[in-house]
Amino acid sequence: MAKKVVDIKKTRIKISAFLFLTAIFALIVRLGYIQIVAGPTYSQEAMKQQYKDTVIYPMRGIIYDRTGKELAVSVPKNDLWIEPDNIKDSEKDAAIETLSKILELDKEEIKKSLSSGKKRFALAKNIDSDKVKKIREAKISGIWFEQSSRRYYPYGKFASHVIGHVSNENVGLAGVEASFNTYLKGIPGREIFIKDARNREISTNSLSYNEPVNGRNLILTIDEVIQHHMERAMEQALVDNNAKRVIAIAMDPQTGDILGMVSKPDYDPNDSRTPLYPLFQEKIDAALSDEEKLKELYTMWRNPAVNDIYEPGSPFKVVTASAALEEGLVYPEEWFNDIGYTEVAGRKIKNLTSKPFGSITFTKAVEQSVNSTFIQIAQRLGAQKFTEYITAFGFGKPTGIALPGEGVGMQYTVSKMGPVELATTSFGQGISVTPIQMISAISAVANDGKLMKPRIVKEVTDENGEIVESFEPEVVKRAVSKTTADQMLAIMESVVANGSGSATKIDGYRIGGKTGTAQKVIDGKYQSGYYISSCAAVAPIEDPQVALLVIVDEPKGASYSGSTISGPVVRQIMQDILRYLGVKPNAQAVIENNDSKIVIPEIRNRKYSEVAIELEKLGIGHVLDAQQEIDTSGIVIDSFPKPGDKVPQGSSVMLYIGSSTDETIIMPDLSGKTVKEVTELLKNMGIEFTPVGSGKAVKQMPSAGTMVKKGNMASVEFE
């Protein structure tokens, strides 16, 4: 019996030893697995709890105008995040008190957020650096800052279709922000530091720090002053004509540089999802889904000057005429006979006016925009030659401008261009082009016949201002010879001097131009009452420095012709540009009717009551803009005609009145004024300034004509 008990005990000991050894073996195997197989994984998890890995976002590159003015900048952005579970109960009240005081937030709101049950949330965004420093010094547990940057556009909706905007993630969505996103975005960096259980940084020294690489900067060809002049004129044209939209492009014909590009209605890139005009607001409100809403937003963001096509009408006659002149198929003083229409393949194609011109020279036919004459010269060219010249002037293919979504346009191939198509294309009907193609073709005539690639970005620079990449002016091809281009310019000058372009005349300057009135195609048919009014111009003829195209889409009023709708707008913009560029009036052009005219004095930035009295003394009347809510105690912010223009005695000047509280004013021309005179003038305007030297003003910044905000600083040099 005793032996049996001993055997049982031995068996139990053996079993216990076996189980113990098995457990030890299993533990060793498990430890081996953890150490060898799962070790890296657990090590990473442990490191995650000990270390904090933070992405450091780069600053997106700055976008400048051609003179160095900042059009798009990145502002540092600090967002404060909180993990409520990592704040000790004993520290919670003190943390709420500190955050409320520094961030100027309501204590109860902070308490409510902390008890919301969220694991983490952003308590405040876009915190300035001083507040960030104070919060860091408070060493509050359970909080951290996420650092990035936000995009800011100092001029608001200024050139919004050209500049574009970015997403919340700082990715370019439109304009050069999109097409040059790779240059602008930069490369993110990383920072790793040790943290405690409450998510607080233990050491001020990073274990690892990879510095971000900031984005490259862009220098555009756009000139801020020219763009502002164009924006103002086109906004007025949109309102005055109750138009669907308006477009304007100013180009340096010798380089292809885009000096200004305006499309309205536009939007504010600082708040890109909020429409500024009823047209877009109504469509977005009517959208039934997020997808439809986004589609309407993209429509608002697209740039019609580059993306959209239209039938150009009579400005296209410049291409037809240039082709015929180049081929020697017509000469300026050749006579044609007009009976008011032309029959082509059994179809009667009429002129814009039903009255026949009878015997008329080619130059006069261009002046009066006689369709029948252009049909005849297109027939002389034939479909093959005509399409070759259309292509030579850059139509039917992208211009290559560095903006997203460029349109191509539509034109007939030789096989598709029958007699009727040949006839209608000759005067710009039945062919679709983009505005950027049209202004490029006009510029080719102003550039000795050479077609330039439109340039919107001049250079890419690093953050030190060193040039990384340059985009030089590029000749695409020669469209016509210099001789032909000179002939065409002379004819275009005659159009302004004697023909349909007379509304673009500027006293003292030689201007060439061509107006157009094109009926719109809607649902596949030309619709009565729907027109595109346009005008293209070049100045000065003796040395072309500016080519300008203005388009008014669907003007609603007594007139819809390009000569009465777009011509005056071209005149206003061209006059502003030429003066800003310092182009002096041509002596020969100044002589005409000088003695019988009165020079409008500088009346901008002066009280309306004073201006009215001064104009009356000069024998000039005035009218106020009916579109404005007039404040007769306000300031004259602009006029039409402009100061410096000559007007007949007894004529009237349109005055644009702004409230004395308006923030934006026009920088006056200070040249020749004394320190005392400048001090008094700028003080009344609310502009501070620093005088340099003594005597009379010889140089100023900002330059005359620039739009500035009250309170801005000006610098004036005196000699």
Residue ranges and their predicted role:
Residues A72, D196-E201, N205, Q254-P315, ...:
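Beta-lactam-recognizing serine transpeptidase/beta-lactamase-like catalytic domain environment
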Residues F471, K505-G508, I522, G529, ...:
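Ligand-recognition elements built from short beta-strands and adjacent flexible loops
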Residues M1-E282, P304, I309, Q384-G394, ...:
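Periplasmic/cell-envelope proteins involved in peptidoglycan metabolism and beta-lactam response
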Residues G61, V246, E334, G340, ...:
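Extracytoplasmic/periplasmic beta-strand context in beta-sandwich domains
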Residues A72-V75, L114, Y155, Y209-V213, ...:
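Short, flexible turn/loop "capping" segments at secondary-structure junctions
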Residues A159, G215, I219, R245-A248, ...:
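Short glycine-rich loop/turn motifs
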Residues W144, N217, R245-I247, W335, ...:
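Residues at or immediately flanking beta-strands
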